[in-house]
């Protein structure tokens, strides 16, 4: 193989390794919740790179945060496949329970903590977010769209009203964040009981929309 091609392959391999190291460092830093953790230059330093390397790999800080979100989305999709593979003849309540349990445990993961801390540092107003961080905003929008599609697919064969599925899919992430927060803070409440109650309520709501 010509030396120029060998050099090109080596350079590409080093670039990919640098990119992976920066994304891993970003998740670790963001998940820590430390003051100043939402800093691309600090993350670059922790990964042994420079701000110039961030710009080369991702363009700017917007591209960097978008890449972090995309990276965690890939791992999230792999996790969600655990419950989307529920047998097609599984009853409705079992499917709701699988979704709730998966999120309840998954929201305590390093990836989830990283995303929560990143979102907390971004503009709350969608117009500001889209103006200042257009690629990050697009990735966040993609998350929501993918989640809705996943939930619709989970109940598609049961004849459930799609609008009710949409409402339930919109509710569940926020509800699970609340329960996870209670668990992290320490609570006298029985959180297993809370999950069962939520599961029963949502399953009943969806069941009522099925053809009789």
Residue ranges and their predicted role:
Residues 1-6, 102-105, 145-160, 170, ...:
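C-terminal peripheral helix-coil segments that are non-catalytic and often amphipathic
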Residues 1-33, 37-46, 63-66:
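Basic, helix-initiating cap at the start of DNA-binding domains
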Residues 21, 25-33, 78-86, 118-122, ...:
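Solvent-exposed, amphipathic alpha-helical segments
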Residues 77-81, 108-118, 126-157, 167-170, ...:
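Amphipathic alpha-helical packing segments from all-alpha helical-bundle domains
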Residues 67, 81-114, 168-172, 195:
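Hydrophobic alpha-helical connector segments
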Residues 47-58:
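Short hydrophobic/aromatic patch on the recognition helix
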Residues 70-76:
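Short, basic, alpha-helical segments at the C-terminal edge of helix-turn-helix-like DNA-binding modules
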């Amino acid at each position: 193989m010509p030396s120029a091609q060998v050099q090109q392959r080596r350079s590409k391999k080093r670039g990919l390794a640098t990119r992976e190291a920066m994304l891993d460092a970003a998740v670790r830093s963001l998940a820590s919740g430390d003051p100043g953790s939402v800093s691309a230059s600090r993350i670059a330093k922790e990964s042994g790179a420079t701000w110039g390397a961030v710009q080369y790999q991702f363009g700017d800080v917007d591209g960097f945060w978008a890449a972090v979100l995309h990276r965690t989305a890939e791992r999230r999709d792999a996790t969600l496949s655990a419950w989307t593979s529920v047998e097609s003849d599984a009853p409705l309540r079992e499917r709701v329970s699988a979704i709730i349990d998966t999120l309840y445990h998954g929201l305590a993961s390093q990836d989830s903590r990283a995303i929560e801390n990143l979102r907390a540092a971004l503009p709350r107003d969608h117009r500001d977010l889209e103006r200042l961080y257009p690629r990050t905003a697009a990735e966040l929008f993609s998350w929501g769209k993918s989640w809705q599609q996943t939930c619709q697919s989970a109940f598609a064969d049961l004849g459930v009203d799609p609008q009710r599925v949409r409402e339930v899919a919109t509710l569940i992430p926020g509800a699970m964040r609340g329960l996870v927060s209670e668990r992290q803070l320490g609570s006298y409440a029985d959180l297993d009981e809370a999950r069962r109650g939520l599961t029963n309520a949502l399953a009943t709501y969806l069941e009522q929309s099925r053809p009789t």
